[in-house]
Amino acid sequence: MIKITKGLDLPIAGMPLQQISPAPAVKRVALLGEEYVGMRPAMAVKEGDRVKKGQILFEDKKTPGVYFTAPASGVVSAIHRGERRVLQSVVIDIEGNEAVAFTRYAADALAELPRDTVQQQLLASGLWTALRTRPFSKTPRPGSVPAAIFVNAMDTNPLAAEPQPIILAERAAFDAGLTVLTRLTDGKVHVCQPSGGKLGGHPAGQVCFNQFSGPHPAGLPGTHIHFLEPVSLNKQVWHLNYQDAIAIGQLFLEGELNCERVIALGGPQVKSPRLVKTTLGASLDDLLAGELEEGENRVISGSVLSGTRAHGPHAFLGRFHLQVSVVREGREKELFGWVMPGKEKFSITRTTLGHFFKRKRFHFSTDTHGGERAMVPIGNYERVMPLDILPTILLRDLLAGDSDSAQALGCLELDEEDLALCTYVCPGKYEYGPALRSVLTQIEQEG
């Protein structure tokens, strides 16, 4: 077991009840184009077209053969584009239950499938896009082979669902998914679970079960990769979440694309925080109807630390998100807030009274309590960064755009979510995720 000592479990109110409840029916689903780093779509459908679940909606021009498929059957009602015609979302009004059929395999035949057969089925179904590379967090190129594959079977994000019961309820499909993944690599398939996890005993020798304990970010793929299979420009690994591993198993066992997902609804503004079963890409306007407290709220697809704001063309469940978080918009101004004791405020630096209430859950809002200022190295980043890097120097180089120094300091191992806690504790109010993405893009382009 690998024990993480540095990090932070954010004490936010609205922890979901770890029991799956019925969810409001959703009438629309969507694929969000901006979730896929560097993707340029070649559209295969237009507004008004009727599509089946699993039918191709568009292909990546930069990576031919990578297809993005419909998560439900229905009619394409809108194709939203932003500045410079960047694809924002492809929206489908759900109608019927028609689905594309794929090849089924017996469970005992999966371990002998050729690599090309596995790749072609994943590509045709759209489940290939569940895989992400590290470094760069992009969809893998068809035909490439990773040094290892990581399946994340734990989640330490604030307000997240507990993965173990969900996996155990679909254990046969999960094990089948792991077997399929072993056909894509000559290395290990690492299953990362929390301390005391009940997963283990897979027949494939390539599957390795690892346990991590400690505060967030102990449950992030970047943490697992750093300690088990560090990457470089010449070494690439892939990762995916546990529900996508289940979906891969179901695809090969049943011959149908399963887009159901169990997600956590949580946050201070959710009336009844709980787990619900819904559809990949579900409309959050439909899903949250009648679920929120009064007032101006911010709906976040994903974690409050690293998720994306869900509004307008983006008001749908993200492809890689297993939770929806809702907090209050913090627009009010506080007179002389800096001299108040701050019983209702949480601080990692012990500057507010709320720091001393260890079991208290706080009603966080979007208020950052100030604007951008100088980046002051007071040890905050080191408190929440468990990786073997120099965070203060790395973050400085990211802001300066110094790609050579940032690469030497380990930025290739990171994704935006790995720096989310650094953004949260930053006294200068900087957003380090976009700075990291800019530097990674520069490194990739320069080779």
Curated annotation (Swiss-Prot):
Keywords: Ion transport, NAD, Sodium, Sodium transport, Translocase, Transport, Ubiquinone. GO terms for molecular function: oxidoreductase activity, acting on NAD(P)H, quinone or similar compound as acceptor. One of its GO terms (biological process) is sodium ion transport. It comes from the Bacteria. Its EC number is 7.2.1.1. It holds the Pfam family NQRA_2nd. It is an enzyme of class 7 (translocase). It catalyses: a ubiquinone + n Na(+)(in) + NADH + H(+) = a ubiquinol + n Na(+)(out) + NAD(+). Belongs to the NqrA family. NQR complex catalyzes the reduction of ubiquinone-1 to ubiquinol by two successive reactions, coupled with the transport of Na(+) ions from the cytoplasm to the periplasm. NqrA to NqrE are probably involved in the second step, the conversion of ubisemiquinone to ubiquinol. Composed of six subunits; NqrA, NqrB, NqrC, NqrD, NqrE and NqrF. This is Na(+)-translocating NADH-quinone reductase subunit A. It comes from Klebsiella pneumoniae (strain 342).
